[in-house]
Amino acid sequence: GESMVRQFLWGQRFTRKYFGYTSNCFWLPDTFGYSAAIPQIMKGCDVDYFLTTKMDWNDTNIFPYDTFYWQGIDGTKVFTHFNRTHCWPAPDDLSKHVYGKGKNGSSIKERSVTDRRLISFGYGDGGGGPQFEMIEESRRVADLNGCCKTYYTTVGDFMTDLEQRVKNPSTYAGELYLELHRGTLTNQHN
């Protein structure tokens, strides 16, 4: 816990000094499970929102939520969003993920809570970021008839807007355990 608090504090100090802002988001896209102490640490460091992607990889129990409040050990809650949409901003990919037309169905688990999705794009596992084609395609589909409405935003603004728009989000208490990579950074060994 102490190491994580230091990382938050030094990270916030760095972004304030060199970029002029304080982040309100904790985004861990490629991590194999999350301690139930994280919400308390986040709130203590003025970080309100948590985002990740891999919880959809569970191989035994499907995690029930993608937009919810995560409650830590001490009862502290942080608003959480799982980005289950991994695609370019191409019209057919967006339709598959958002409207459930692909082999895996919709990337939205609880439409009664929200129908909004953060679509992050670019090459991540090796750097590279977004390519010109991805940015251009995103621009072109922004108002394309028959495609879901898209727009550019910051992660912090997306999360703030999402929290204001959700309807009756669930609360999940405890560790976020990723079954696919059992025992990594958790207290569960089997």
Predicted regions and their residues:
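Catalytic-domain carbohydrate-binding cleft regions of carbohydrate-active enzymes
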Residues: 1-190
